[in-house]
C-alpha cells in the first residue's frame, strides 16, 4: 500500500481530524486509509484483537465494539462473511487475553444502499449468536431509515437489540424514524432531539438510551462548540444519556479525554459525569446478571 506519508506525523492529517471539518461526510473520508490496510481476514482479526487490548490499556472493563463488515471488505474485496468471522475471532482472542468483557454490534452502512446492506446483514447473521445488536450508520440525510425497515425487522427477529445513528446529520424526524420504523432502543448522537419537545418527552418516557459523542460532534460541525452540546440538557432532563468516543482513532481521543476534558468543557459537573456513567451501565446491552458482575468487578 502506497501511503501519503512515510512518518507517523506526516500520516496523521490523512487519518485523523486535526480541526473541525465541514460535515459528517468529510469526517468519514478519514476512514479510507484505515480500510486500505485491511488487506485480508487476518488483518481484520488483528485489528479487532488490538481494539480490545487498547481498551484494557485505557482501564476499560466493558466494551461495546461496532463494525461494518461490508465497509471493511470494500478496499480489497474480502468476502464479507469472512470479515465477520475474523472480527468475532479477534475480539474473542482479545477478551481472553485481557479479561475485558466485549459485546459486538453489527453496523449496516446505509451509504452503500439497501441492497448492499442486505448482503451485509446476511453476513452478520452467520454469526448471530456472537452479536448483541444491529446499528445503522453513514449518510443519514440521503439514506433514511425507511429504506431499511425490513433489514431491522430481520435483526430484531434474530434477537438483536437496535441502536441507530440519528439526529446527527439529520434532524429530529430522523430520530423519530429510528425509533418508530426501526425499533431503536438507543440512539447514537441524537443531538437534534433538543429541537423537538415531544421527542424529548418520548425519549424520557420510553427510557431510550442516548450515545452522546462530544468531541466527534464538534469535529463534524454537528455542534459549534463543546459548550453548545446538548448533553448537559439531556442529563438535566433525566434522559439516559451517556459519554462515548465515537471513532477514537480518527478523533485522536480516548474515553478518559471525554470524561476529564471534553465533558467539563461541555458544562458537565462531576455529578453529571457520574450520572452518565450510571446511565451507561443501565443501557448497556448486558443481561442483568452481567451488569451485576460488572458492578462487583469495579467496586
Task: Place the predicted regions along the sequence by residue.
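Short HxH-centered metal-ligating active-site micro-motif
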Residues: 165
Amino acid at each position: 500500500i502506497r501511503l501519503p506519508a512515510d512518518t507517523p506525523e506526516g500520516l496523521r492529517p490523512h487519518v485523523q481530524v486535526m480541526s473541525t471539518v465541514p460535515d459528517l461526510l468529510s469526517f468519514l473520508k478519514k476512514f479510507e486509509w484505515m480500510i486500505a490496510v485491511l488487506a485480508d481476514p487476518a488483518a481484520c482479526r488483528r485489528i479487532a484483537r488490538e481494539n480490545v487490548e487498547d481498551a484494557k490499556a485505557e482501564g476499560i472493563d466493558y466494551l461495546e465494539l461496532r463494525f461494518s463488515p461490508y465497509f471493511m471488505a470494500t478496499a480489497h474485496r474480502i468476502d464479507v462473511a469472512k470479515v465477520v468471522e475474523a472480527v468475532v475471532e479477534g475480539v474473542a482472542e482479545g477478551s481472553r487475553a485481557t479479561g475485558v468483557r466485549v459485546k459486538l454490534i453489527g453496523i449496516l452502512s446505509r451509504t452503500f444502499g439497501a441492497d448492499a446492506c442486505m448482503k451485509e446483514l446476511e453476513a452478520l447473521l452467520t454469526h448471530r449468536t456472537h452479536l448483541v445488536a444491529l446499528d445503522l450508520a453513514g449518510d443519514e440525510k440521503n439514506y433514511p431509515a425507511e429504506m431499511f425497515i425490513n433489514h431491522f425487522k430481520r435483526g430484531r427477529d434474530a434477537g438483536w437489540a437496535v441502536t441507530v445513528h440519528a439526529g446527527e446529520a439529520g434532524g429530529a424526524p430522523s430520530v423519530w424514524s429510528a425509533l418508530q420504523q426501526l425499533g431503536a432502543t438507543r440512539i447514537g448522537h441524537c443531538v437534534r432531539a433538543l429541537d423537538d419537545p415531544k421527542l424529548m418527552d418520548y425519549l424520557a418516557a420510553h427510557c431510550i438510551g442516548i450515545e452522546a459523542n462530544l468531541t466527534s460532534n464538534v469535529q463534524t460541525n454537528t455542534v459549534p462548540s463543546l459548550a453548545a452540546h446538548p448533553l448537559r440538557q439531556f442529563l438535566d432532563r433525566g434522559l439516559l444519556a451517556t459519554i462515548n468516543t465515537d471513532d477514537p482513532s480518527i478523533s485522536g481521543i480516548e474515553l478518559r479525554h471525554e470524561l476529564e476534558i471534553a465533558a467539563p468543557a461541555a458544562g458537565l459537573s462531576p455529578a453529571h459525569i457520574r450520572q452518565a456513567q450510571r446511565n451507561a451501565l443501565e443501557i448497556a446491552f448486558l443481561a442483568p446478571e452481567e451488569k451485576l458482575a460488572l458492578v462487583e468487578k469495579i467496586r
